[in-house]
Amino acid sequence: MKIGVLALQGAVREHIRHIELSGYEGIAIKRVEQLDEIDGLILPGGESTTLRRLMDLYGFKEKLQQLDLPMFGTCAGLIVLAKNVENESGYLNKLDITVERNSFGRQVDSFESELDIKGIANDIEGVFIRAPHIAKVDNGVEILSKVGGKIVAVKQGQYLGVSFHPELTDDYRITKYFIEHMIKH
């Protein structure tokens, strides 16, 4: 089984490392044609506006909207998966959620927190860097974790989204969960 990581920006190598530690093949996705070779896709963090522009430029948006591909979005990747972002439309419209950008503050307000993530573990380390939070969930969306009352992890069908950066820690259990419960099922 091959798991792709969208390689337009973000911690691509770190995500691939987590895929490999989970026992699977990880590949950097740089061209739209590569999407046909994978079983699931991770959308990494970075800057969400830049990520959307690059996805438009290289033709990823249309292809990803058409494909029925399991996807896992971290930080900016979560924003890209959302149906609504603050007071604007979403991008890929895969998760029935509304996201608020940078809701934990600026870069200097970055922090780490131990998270209890339903169905995965109660001791996951979350790295929050200019992180969004999920302000609203619609029917069919399962809340997996909160920090300070703010929703930071959800799943819906074959889509998983988190506000933080699991790839910046040595703990690959979230990636393994995505592969083994949302792709292999």
Swiss-Prot record:
EC numbers: 4.3.3.6, 3.5.1.2
Keyword Transmembrane helix attached: no
Subunit structure of this chain's protein: In the presence of PdxS, forms a dodecamer of heterodimers. Only shows activity in the heterodimer.
HAMAP family associated with the record: PdxT
Family named by the database record: Belongs to the glutaminase PdxT/SNO family.
Function per UniProt: Catalyzes the hydrolysis of glutamine to glutamate and ammonia as part of the biosynthesis of pyridoxal 5'-phosphate. The resulting ammonia molecule is channeled to the active site of PdxS.
Name of the molecule in the record: Pyridoxal 5'-phosphate synthase subunit PdxT
Organism: Staphylococcus epidermidis (strain ATCC 12228 / FDA PCI 1200)
Lineage: Bacteria, Bacillati, Bacillota, Bacilli, Bacillales
